[in-house]
From Swiss-Prot:
The keyword Lyase applies. Pathway: Amino-sugar metabolism; 1,6-anhydro-N-acetylmuramate degradation; Amino-sugar metabolism; N-acetylmuramate degradation; Cell wall biogenesis; peptidoglycan recycling. This is N-acetylmuramic acid 6-phosphate etherase. Belongs to the GCKR-like family. MurNAc-6-P etherase subfamily. InterPro entries: Etherase_MurQ, Glucokinase_regulatory_CS, MURQ/GCKR, SIS_dom, SIS_dom_sf. One of its GO terms (biological process) is peptidoglycan turnover. The keyword ATP-binding does not apply. The gene is murQ. Homodimer. It comes from Vibrio campbellii (strain ATCC BAA-1116). A lyase-type mechanism (elimination/hydration) is suggested for the cleavage of the lactyl ether bond of MurNAc 6-phosphate, with the formation of an alpha,beta-unsaturated aldehyde intermediate with (E)-stereochemistry, followed by the syn addition of water to give product.
Length: 308
């Protein structure tokens, strides 16, 4: 695309428009500046609320993929790519899953997480190649993230995923975007022009983060990774998480700190297993087998077994 064509294309994007509510932001003192930013930020959850049906549909497709061994792959450039990498990296400690289950790809590779890599987003071929490099298959789901909805790197990835029959999801902050047109599910929270014109790391980035939170959290809940609203598959990999594991067991069972700690040590800090043992009086092997029989759903395991 020529420079003139690109300028014309950007002129039609909501996310590139000038915000009439912040035209004088350069004249304001600090408190007034952050108040204006805060006023704009308040619009974000309202925009996300309007696309909850699409988010729920995406959750169902992601959950279905997980159940057959598929992966969730995020791909984006710049802020969009970094947000995908961030959400993917939080899944193993939060939900006790493999770091291969949710993958974040950013245009330009890992180096682009810390420092912008100029031109990386302009290649659709690079998007396709990055998916090929991780052996992306039709069992997987790809979420293309682009505030503008027109990033070539993301378009290339989505088109390749479509070619091999994988599920494609587009996350953009502009209506009727190019990536929305080629995806199975289009999630488009329109947050309006940014407080600082074109700086889509602001409202657009916040909206994307909220949506990504929902996609992984809701999908993991659907897989039985929570009991009530407790993170029962959390991995106790540091002192804070060891303490959190004990608190979760105490909250789920009303047991003492001493009992929670003792049983957690028996289970090698498998929180879900410790809770089931305390609530049902099962020994560790019986509890493990019963939990497996209920496909890892702790609530089902508890409700289907009465204490001795």
């Amino acid at each position: 695309m020529t420079n003139d064509a690109l300028i014309a294309a950007l002129a039609h994007l909501v996310s590139e428009g000038r915000n009439p509510d912040t035209m004088d932001i350069d004249l304001l003192p600090s408190l007034d500046i952050v108040q204006r930013l805060n006023q704009q930020d308040k619009l974000v959850p309202l925009a996300v609320e309007k696309v909850l049906p699409e988010i729920a549909l995406a959750v169902d497709k992601i959950t279905d993929a997980f159940k057959v061994g598929g992966r969730l792959v995020y791909m984006g450039a710049g802020t969009s790519g970094r947000l995908g990498v961030l959400d993917a990296s939080e899944c193993p400690p939060t939900f006790g899953v493999s770091d291969k289950m949710v993958v974040g790809l950013i245009a330009g590779g890992p180096e682009a997480i810390l420092k912008a890599k100029e031109g990386a987003e302009d290649s659709p071929v690079l998007g396709e190649q990055d998916l090929k490099d991780i052996k992306f298959t039709n069992l997987d789901v790809v979420v293309g993230i682009a505030a503008s909805g027109r990033t070539p790197y993301v378009i290339g990835g989505l088109e390749y995923a479509n070619e091999i029959g994988a599920t494609t999801i587009a996350l953009s902050c502009n209506p009727d975007s190019p990536i929305a047109d080629i995806a199975d599910v289009a999630i488009s929270p329109v947050v309006g022009p940014e407080a600082l014109t074109g700086s889509t790391r602001l409202k657009s980035g916040t909206a994307q983060k909220l949506v990504l939170n929902m996609l992984t959290t809701a999908s993991m809940i659907r897989l039985g990774k929570s009991y009530q609203n407790l993170m029962v598959d959390v991995k106790a990999t540091n002192n804070k998480l060891v303490a959190r594991a004990a608190r979760i067991v105490m909250q789920a069972t009303d047991c003492s700190k001493e009992q929670a700690t003792e049983v957690l040590k028996q289970t090698d800090y498998e929180v879900k297993l410790a809770i089931l043992m305390i609530l049902t009086d099962l020994d560790i092997e019986s509890a493990r087998a019963h939990l497996h029989h209920q496909d890892g759903f702790l609530r089902k395991a508890v409700e289907s077994h009465q204490p001795k």
